[in-house]
Regions:
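Fungal secretory targeting signals
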Residues: 1-21
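Signature for phosphate-centric chemistry
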Residues: 18-169, 173-334, 338-469
Length: 469
């Protein structure tokens, strides 16, 4: 939208003010909306969705000479409010800033300027952002709309696989925002399909039969590699705190509060369309923040965690089974919605972003930096597995947030794909040595030792109650 039409829109909205004044007393500054997209890749996957910033030059469309046979999706929920914990710490920080007795100077001056805090209502925490709960209706980054748009894009590219179908399943965890995303995605396909939503419980009692196999892994230790990742510098945080404390005498902002300002910036964009708080940071500080997030994710839930690949391997293995059974299975479209951490586990198993050696914490990896967490799992992340046939051969490849990401040593097929039997060997080598049930002591919480829901949903009908987690 150009700026002239935004101004007209603002004027029109001003006339319609009664509908919105209970939410926001002062209107968002429309001239700022859309100007901060360059920094989304630096905001730890908390800012709105964006496409993968690099490509190998290959289109995500199936190559002309090939015919699509099956598609799978692992998706993250859309743009959301902060979690309870982050929401509470941002609210505490806001109260501290609001309590500051002098006028602000420097980067925080905007707080004096009729600023309204973007988290007035804790009941929104953990929720997807929707037209009903956002602060300003001209915000273009609403989770609801992102999910609908994704549904339409999916249908445009893969709808041919649903041609003869009147019904098909969509699998989702029972987190409310994950389910809502799946539902908005499905609703956007129109009413010619009877979609059967399979709501899979996140509870550890589900064992291996879940989209959140992390939760059922009794031995998982997110901080197992703390001795490695905690070596990363925190100087960028002291720099921010010192700068703001110098500009504003007596503010006494701590390093951890400086760290919270990044989340403030990201979530305020989700809710309002932009955030003045983002202007607090220098480009370098954003780079340090982003690398710290990449590197800690690698050790928390990625290939750097002793059980990252094992936990994601359950879902990767099920995905490989679906590919192998593409001829027999009547359903050709396997859509699954879950959280970023679970998609990170799955990507760890798949290996397309595995650098193959530990990520350094002593410095920012420059030459060898394939693991960008926010590029992999921004809000609304979408990891597609495509299976297509070209003459007499079948091929597999991944499309992550619109970019084809080839498997390094298996990309000689059309569109940088990997021939299916070679892909199966590749997958076996990734999963070799992993044993979810014994490594995770899953038997302490569950007797479900394998993932069955893709195969038994019609008999079982999964219908777990939704919750805010
Ligand atoms: C606000 O300032 C008053 C007076 O300085 C202080 O007693 C109170 O604890 C402060 N509240 C917060 C939330 O910082
Ligand atoms: C749809 O049905 C037609 C005619 O029966 C068949 O040729 C085609 O392969 C089917 N398409 C899919 C995606 O199942
Ligand atoms: C939709 O599917 C469900 C379960 O698969 C079935 O019970 C229901 O009758 C179907 N509804 C329509 C209108 O086809
Ligand atoms: C996780 O690993 C860290 C580092 O080895 C260790 O200090 C911590 O006690 C472990 N936590 C659990 C619950 O085992
Ligand atoms: C600044 O905050 C620290 C704790 O965050 C506190 O110990 C210290 O007394 C505070 N200093 C001032 C001047 O308020
Ligand atoms: C992968 O799935 C197959 C079929 O369900 C199962 O036999 C095998 O044990 C699984 N392997 C892993 C590593 O999960
Ligand atoms: C597949 O086609 C190629 C040429 O297009 C041929 O050389 C090859 O023998 C065929 N393979 C099979 C298994 O039919
Ligand atoms: C699995 O690993 C073992 C031991 O490291 C090795 O001997 C075997 O060839 C591997 N199998 C596959 C399929 O990669
Ligand atoms: C789980 O399995 C382990 C070894 O396979 C066994 O030692 C343990 O007793 C089992 N625990 C339960 C609760 O079944
Ligand atoms: C498996 O565990 C569930 C509860 O976690 C229990 O209801 C069920 O009876 C168990 N099944 C078997 C075969 O032990
Ligand atoms: C977040 O807070 C809501 C409302 O208090 C509660 O229902 C939910 O369980 C909480 N979720 C988490 C993960 O703490």
């Amino acid at each position: 939208m150009n700026s002239v039409s935004l101004v007209l829109l603002a004027a029109a909205l001003a006339n319609a003010a009664p509908a919105t004044t209970d939410k926001q007393q002062t209107f968002a500054d429309v001239s700022k909306i859309g100007t901060q997209e360059d920094i989304f890749p630096y905001l730890a996957g908390s800012a709105p969705h964006f496409s993968y910033p690099l490509s190998y030059g290959v289109s995500k469309e199936v190559p002309d000479q090939c015919v699509l046979q099956q598609v799978q999706l692992f998706a993250r929920h859309g743009e959301r409010y902060p979690t309870n914990n982050t929401g509470a710490s941002l609210t505490t920080l806001y109260k501290k800033l609001n309590n500051y007795s002098s006028k602000f100077s420097g980067a925080l001056e905007f707080l004096d300027d009729d600023y309204e805090f973007f988290l007035p209502d804790p009941s929104n925490f953990e929720e997807l952002t929707t037209w009903n709960n956002i602060l300003d209706p001209i915000n273009p980054y609403v989770g609801e709309w992102d999910a609908q748009k994704h549904g339409r894009e999916f249908f445009q590219q893969y709808g041919e696989l649903l041609k003869n179908k009147t019904s098909f399943p969509i699998f989702t965890s029972n987190s409310k925002r994950v389910h809502d995303t799946a539902k908005f995605f499905g609703d956007a396909l129109g009413d010619k399909f009877n979609i059967s939503y399979q709501i899979i419980d996140e509870d550890p009692s589900m064992g291996a039969n879940s989209l959140t196999t992390l939760n059922s892994c009794a031995t998982y230790n997110k901080t197992a590699k703390a001795d490695v990742y905690s070596k990363f510098t925190t100087k960028y945080l002291s720099d921010i705190a010192n700068r703001l404390n110098t500009e504003n005498k007596g503010l006494n902002l701590s390093k951890s509060e400086a760290n919270s300002l990044f989340a403030w910036c990201a979530y305020e964009i989700n809710v309002k369309g932009y955030s003045n708080m983002c202007d607090v940071f220098t480009d370098e500080e954003l780079t340090y923040y982003a690398y710290n997030d990449d590197m800690t994710s690698y050790y928390y839930h990625g290939p750097g965690n002793p059980l990252g690949i094992t936990v994601g391997g359950v879902n990767f293995n099920a995905s490989v089974e679906l590919l192998k059974q593409h001829k027999e299975l009547d359903n050709k479209v396997w859509l699954s919605f879950t959280h970023d951490t679970n998609v990170v586990n799955i990507l760890a198993a798949i290996g397309i972003f595995d650098p193959g050696h530990p990520m350094p914490a002593e410095y920012i990896a420059i030459k060898d930096h394939i693991y960008h967490k926010s590029w992999m799992v921004p809000q609304g992340a979408r990891v597609y597995t495509q299976l297509y046939q070209c003459s007499n051969q079948t091929y597999v490849r991944y499309v992550v947030n619109d970019a084809v990401i080839p498997i390094e040593k298996c990309s000689s097929g059309p569109g940088l794909s990997c021939e299916l039997s070679k892909f199966v060997d590749y997958a076996e080598s990734r999963l070799n040595g992993t044993d979810y049930v014994s490594s995770c002591k899953t038997n302490t919480t569950s007797n479900q030792t394998s993932l069955t829901f893709y195969w038994d949903y019609q008999q079982k009908h999964y219908d777990a109650p939704l919750g805010l987690f």
